[in-house]
Amino acid sequence: LVGGRLRRRPIRDVARADLPPHVPTLRELFDTFGTGFDLSLDLKDPDAGPAVIADSLGTDPTMASRLWLCDQDHERLATLRELSPHIRLVDSTRLSRIKEGPERRAARLQELGIDAINLHHSDWSGGLSTLFHRFGLCTFGWDAQFDRILDGLLRMGLDGVFSDHVPRMVDALDRNAVARGLDPLDLNPEGP
């Protein structure tokens, strides 16, 4: 969504020339940074998935395994698997929205070929992370803005976190590695 609080509208309804310059197209993003990284995108527009996949794979066919598409509708998300067997699909939800319970959701995600579940940091526990891992799912936590939250999510065994603060995430990974008796440089060979 773009615009102020009173006039928000879907980005697909806005001409490219009317978007702020800090909002790149996928092509501009890849032209600027290349494709040698994992990219996670929230599909806020239910029709965006096919275009995102086409643009990403049109730029670099190897991007599929590094493209993580997140949607709050896991049934709709699963239909994207037909477009590429290698893209990563992420059910992005809240624990309170999982009416059938976490174990049944995990089983359904496994059945649909979904790769991960992404919950708000406050929804996670170590037991819940273990449950989803038992079904072969990666576990992600979003809105991890503070050290204590990042540290807690990593201690719970989450596979990934979403934060607005890259240096904090790197520091949290280093602290987690030290706590587990590992050398942080083994996890980050390029250094801080």
Where are these regions (language model features)?
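An active-site metal/cofactor-coordinating segment within enzyme catalytic domains
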Residues: 1-38, 44, 91-92, 178-192
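C-terminal active-site rim and adjoining tail of enzyme catalytic domains
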Residues: 20-21, 91-192
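Solvent-exposed polar/charged
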Residues: 31-32, 82, 130, 155
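Short, well-ordered coil/turn segments that N-cap beta-strands
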Residues: 34-39, 63-67, 85-88, 113-115, ...
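Active-site cleft segment of glycoside hydrolase catalytic domains centered on the general acid/base Glu
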Residues: 36-42, 47-67
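Distinct, well-ordered alpha-helical segments
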Residues: 48-59, 75-85, 100-110
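Short beta-strand-to-loop elements that line the ligand-binding cleft
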Residues: 67-70, 142
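Aromatic-lined carbohydrate-recognition surfaces of secreted/lumenal glycan-active proteins
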Residues: 70-73, 86-92
